[in-house]
UniProtKB/Swiss-Prot annotation:
Subunit structure, as described in the record: Homodimer; facilitating circular RNAs (circRNAs) formation. Associates with the spliceosome. Interacts with HOOK2. Interacts with ZFC3H1 in a RNase-sensitive manner.
Major localisation: nucleus
Localization of this protein: Nucleus speckle
Name of protein: Zinc finger CCCH domain-containing protein 14
Covalent link Glycyl lysine isopeptide (Lys-Gly) (interchain with G-Cter in SUMO2), residues: 99, 139, 175, 198, 245, 283, 295, 357, 378, 413, 489
Species for this entry: Macaca fascicularis
Phosphoserine carried by residues: 85, 240, 281, 327, 343, 390, 409, 421, 498, 515, 527, 620
Biased composition regions of type Polar residues, renumbered to the chain: 78-103, 131-145
Family indicated by similarity: Belongs to the ZC3H14 family.
ZnF start-end (C3H1-type): 595-620, 621-640, 641-656, 682-699, 701-719
Span of the signal peptide: none
Annotated spans, Disordered: 78-146, 310-350, 398-430
């Protein structure tokens, strides 16, 4: 890697010097761009076309020089690169069945197939049980082809050319690099040690790729451990030596490794070794899973495989993948293909931080927008501190003495602020008492009324201390039986009327999820009638009807009582005999909200108040139209006027959507008093010029002298017209 980086750096510095010589060097981006073109194997013509914008007339001179340098580099690297083959040429070639078949001509053919400047192949490797793929896993030469910015290629091999003269047993040992992470879940050798008396074939999964270790008895393993260390040291020293032996060595190893998959060898192994995996399909599934995890290359030590003593004819490896089913648990794996480098310079690549930031923000937004639970809206009302009074204690004693009935009052929960310890203790005792006893609904209603009465009185005081109130739960309303006595019905109606405040106060639960809180501090000022919703108003005016639990509980703390309602409520509570009748309540309701007037809204159909308008909006068509005498004041629908706002007819029976501008009728002209008529013809007529002449002046005929009617009664002036000849013009004679 260091040699390739050094070559790339030298090429880049040479390009930079050449650009400075030509006077075209501006910054570091142009040499980087040229290095990218070199990495992409651009031809001289393509480079000339791309660099003409930057170099101008010196483009051809520069590209000729650059390609000359690259050709020299290729000629220098041809000799070392011919010593080894690329991954495709080495491992995709058919493996011969005999060692003698691999001749020097084949070696020369492999050398010729290696390009001088090679890029790692991005073709997906095959994952089958072929010997060629098996040899790719534990190959003799660890070809590391590094192309740094496309400048040069360094073909580096770590070779194990040594052969043992006669090793007692064979070891294929592929070990991960020391900085690789070891998958502890798949390390079967250390977690499942087998008996030392019996040699076992164990499949060990490392971090980057699966490897095979054929374990021997402990004696032979200890003897060979030092040999492995020596070979690993010798491997680092042999980088470019013994090139001629590499292909022969590799072919021999491939040949011997291929024999491991032959049926005769497998049968003998099954007799001698106990396989760790009995189920071959399970082993292959684990190989596939581990193949997806491979990312990094490994440092492998390759030792010649000992020949098994078989006199039978050696067979070529079968191409079918299914031929390995039922065989011993040997691993055939493919090294991970090199990671593809982007061709763009780092300055033009996408910023990974932006992508990661966008992903994290998207995840945060998803987690924030989900899991919202509905929390009732809270309102802060001024409440004076209250203490338990003698009346409240008396009511509690009455509740204790009540006989139990089948009706159960729902439990009421209350938590007061920590500062008001007296209120908390007393309220808790009372609520527990109500929840334990089966209370008669009338008594529970009376108790609730008395408690709420003090709430109301404390609200009347101008105390600005605020407690956060919450909408009551559905279980806090008490159903009133229709056959109770009139005093209790009045109390229930008052409870419904004042249902905005007469709910149990609750402290805000700290464990509830956060939600928008609208805290409004009302310093003893009741809300105006306009702020009440329609449902609340309807609730106020239908207070005489028995209220079911759900409808009453939905009202909640939506507003405050009107002053008139507070006065009415205090009168009812002060009346011990309950003589305050329902009739007075209904009178109050009617007085508060007048019914709709039986008068048509003058803004209809463009009225903005809609159903809230106090005037009548027509719905059904008028049956008397167009003879309806009410015109625009009719309570039924009339058709639209085609003139709409431009209509000037004051009593137009049609409907006008736009507002008409009232047209003032012109003031009638006062006719002058008629002079006394006289049948005597004015003597000065038609030349009379007196406007108030009392005499008769005949009316002129509009056709004047051209009138042809002999019986025309109008006046025709008698004008003496000159004769015809007098109207003829003659040119005067001029004397010559």
């Amino acid at each position: 890697m260091e040699i390739g980086t050094e070559i790339s750096r030298k090429i880049r510095s040479a390009i930079k010097g050449k650009l400075q010589e030509l006077g075209a060097y501006v910054d570091e981006e142009l040499p980087d761009y040229i290095m990218v073109m070199v990495a992409n194997k651009k031809s001289q013509d393509q480079m000339t076309e791309d660099l003409s914008l930057f170099l101008g007339n010196n483009t051809i001179r520069f590209t000729v020089w650059l390609h000359g340098v690259l050709d020299k580099l290729r000629s220098v690297t041809t000799e070392p690169s011919s010593l080894k083959s690329s991954d495709t040429n080495i491992f995709d070639s058919n493996v011969p069945s005999n060692k003698s078949n691999f001749s020097r001509g084949d070696e020369r053919r492999h050398e010729a197939a290696v390009p001088p400047l090679a890029i790692p192949s991005t073709r997906p490797e095959k994952r089958d049980s072929r010997v060629s793929t098996s040899s790719q896993e534990s190959k003799t030469t660890n070809v590391r082809q590094t192309y740094d910015d496309g400048a040069a290629t360094r073909l580096m091999s770590t070779v194990k050319p040594l052969r043992e003269p006669a090793p007692s047993e064979d070891v294929i040992d592929i070990k991960p690099e020391p900085d690789d992470l070891i998958d502890e879940d798949l390390n079967f050798v250390q977690e499942n040690p087998l008996s030392q008396k019996k040699p076992t074939v164990t499949l060990t999964y490392g971090s980057s790729r699966p490897s095979i270790e054929i374990y021997r008895p402990p004696a032979s393993r200890n003897a060979d451990s030092g040999v492995h260390l020596n070979r690993l040291q010798f491997q680092q020293q042999q980088n470019s030596i013994h090139a001629a032996k590499q292909l022969d060595m590799q072919n021999s190893w491939v040949y011997e490794t291929g024999r491991l998959c032959e049926p005769e060898v497998l049968n003998s192994l099954e007799e001698t070794y106990s396989p760790f995996f009995r189920n071959n399909s399970e082993k292959m599934s684990m190989e596939d899973e581990n193949f997806r995890k491979r990312k990094l290359p490994v440092v492998s030590s390759v030792v010649k495989v000992k020949k098994f003593n078989h006199d039978g004819e050696e067979e070529e490896e079968d191409d079918d993948y299914g031929s390995r089913t039922g065989s011993i648990s040997s691993s055939v794996s493919v090294p991970a293909k090199p990671e593809r480098r982007p061709s763009l310079p780092p300055s033009k690549q996408a910023n990974k931080n932006l992508i990661l930031k966008a992903i994290s923000e998207a995840q945060e937004s998803v987690t924030k927008t989900t899991n919202y639970s509905t929390v009732p809206q809270k309102q802060t009302l001024p409440v004076a501190p209250r203490t338990r009074t003698s009346q409240e204690e008396l009511l509690a004693e009455v509740v204790q003495g009540q006989s139990r009935t089948p009706r159960i009052s729902p439990p009421i929960k209350e938590e007061e602020t920590k500062g008001d310890s007296v209120e908390k203790n007393q309220g808790t005792q009372q609520r527990q008492l109500l929840s334990r006893l089966q209370i008669d609904p009338v008594m529970a209603e009376t108790l609730q009324m008395s408690q709420d009465y003090y709430d109301m009185e404390s609200m009347v005081h101008a105390d600005t201390r605020s407690f956060i109130l919450k909408k009551p739960k559905l279980s806090e309303e008490i159903v009133v039986a229709p056959n109770q006595e009139s005093g209790m019905k009045t109390a229930d109606s008052l409870r419904v009327l004042s249902g905005h405040l007469m709910q149990t106060r609750d402290l805000v639960q700290p464990d509830k999820p956060a939600s928008p809180k609208f805290i409004v501090t009302l310093d003893g000022v009741p809300s105006p009638p306009g702020y009440m919703s329609d449902q609340e108003e309807d609730m106020c005016f239908e207070g005489m009807k028995p209220v079911n639990q759900t409808a009453a509980s939905n009202k909640g703390l939506r507003g405050l009582l009107h002053p008139q309602q507070l006065h009415l409520l205090s009168r009812q509570l002060e009346d011990p005999n309950g003589s305050f009748s329902n009739a007075e309540m209904s009178e109050l309701s009617v007085a508060q909200k007048p019914e709709k007037l039986l008068e048509r809204c003058k803004y209809w159909p463009a009225c903005k108040n809609g159903d809230e308008c106090a005037y009548h909006h027509p719905i059904s068509p008028c049956k008397a139209f167009p003879n309806c005498k009410f015109a625009e004041k009719c309570l039924f629908v009339h058709p639209n006027c085609k003139y709409d706002a431009k209509c000037t007819k004051p009593d137009c029976p049609f409907t006008h959507v736009s507002r008409r501008i009232p047209v003032l009728s012109p003031k009638p002209a006062v006719a002058p008093p008629a002079p006394p008529s006289s049948s005597q013809l004015c003597r000065y007529f038609p030349a009379c010029k007196k406007m108030e002449c009392p005499f008769y002046h005949p009316k002129h005929c509009r056709f004047n002298t051209q009138c042809t009617r002999p019986d025309c009664t109008f006046y025709h002036p008698t004008i003496n017209v000159p004769p015809r000849h007098a109207l003829k013009w003659i040119r005067p004679q001029t004397s010559e």
